[in-house]
């Protein structure tokens, strides 16, 4: 089994803003090269960063793995996170759909890159 990439979404279900990469310089350059495809949708964060706490341990088993993190808008994160407001009924359906579309598009591009 060979793991080459992983993605995590664990920063809330808010409007998408981009993706971060914990990987090689080549992985980071690839990520940055994808930014133009997302510009029209107001995604602008394509930078070196943290993949996520849940996928982080994969680096021990697969040192070359590229870890990507989905970055949503963070303005209201602590209005919800671990508060009484942190229930599914309070999730903005449109923002969740936009995030799902961004991640699906990103995964398609990732698949094309690592074929």
Regions found by a protein language model. Give the residues of each.
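Metal-dependent peptidase/peptidase-like ectodomains
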Residues: 1-80
